[in-house]
Amino acid sequence: VFPLSFAEFLRFNGILRNPPQGGFTAKEKGVLRRAAKDYLERGGFPDVQDVSDSMRVAMLQGYVDAVLYRDVLERHSVPSVQALKYTLDYLFHNYARKTSTRSISGVLKNLSVAANRESIADYLDWFKDAYLIYPVSVKSDSLAVKRVNPDKYYLIDTGLIRAMCVKNDLERGWLLENLVFMALRRGSNKIAYYLNGDGTEVDFHVFNKLARTSRLVQVSWDTADKATFAREFDALVAARKETGITDCTIVTWDDEGEKDGIRIVPVWKWLLAW
């Protein structure tokens, strides 16, 4: 069972069964904002929608355990169950960030957990095959560039992330980025992150394999943090210049506008297209 899309989440919960695609009333905007917050926090698995918060956490943790045992431990010869579990825990706490077998190996070593990099690479492949994680590589045709720029890993559901992490470890910007990735994954898209020549990054370079078109998507929680937003905006402008891609969007939590030909779209509106 895969998580619901935002549109499916709305229908499943009886919220704006036919949300407008154009203008929104103030009431509709309020409803969609609240729904987006619930979607981010609960996630999209149907079975956990109508239960208490504590029951939801228990069910989602049980889901991870079931996948771990059914899809990994029962199918593969695992050299260290402890290392396997610590690797998964690391991914739940470091999603949407560059992650390598070297970095995971270093963390495990500090925890006195033995695991070589080859085994960790196997664990990552098995988690991917079990649809728990999705790797995203740097946009490049060069194997050398890909070797020195590790993949980023996204989780299948933000509700799972919240269930597996203590509250103080949750960072809303990373959650929003994971939510945007999972929406992009639903299309016929090849997704990478884009590295500019100056070292700055754009979260997603998206190539639609059917339409043969490309777009750039940056995720920023809001525009209020001027320094952070300027850094993310400037990176997108640089990528637009380097790639020639004109379809550029910044997805925020609730800010909307346009700047220098770049759309700024709140996630509750952006998700309706996916």
Residue ranges and their predicted role:
Residues 22-63:
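Amphipathic alpha-helical "lid/sensor" segments that cap RecA-like P-loop NTPase cores
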Residues 1-7:
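A short helix-turn-beta junction within AAA+ P-loop NTPase domains corresponding to the substrate/partner-engaging
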Residues 12-21, 66-70:
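Conserved AAA+ ATPase "sensor/coupling" helix adjacent to the nucleotide-binding pocket
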Residues 50-213:
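Accessory nucleic acid-recognition modules appended to NTPase machines
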Residues 244-252:
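Short, hydrophobic beta-strand segments that form beta-sheet elements in well-ordered domains
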Residues 253-274:
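Domain-level recognition of nuclease-like catalytic cores that cleave nucleotide substrates
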Residues 222-242:
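Mg2+/Mn2+-dependent nuclease catalytic core
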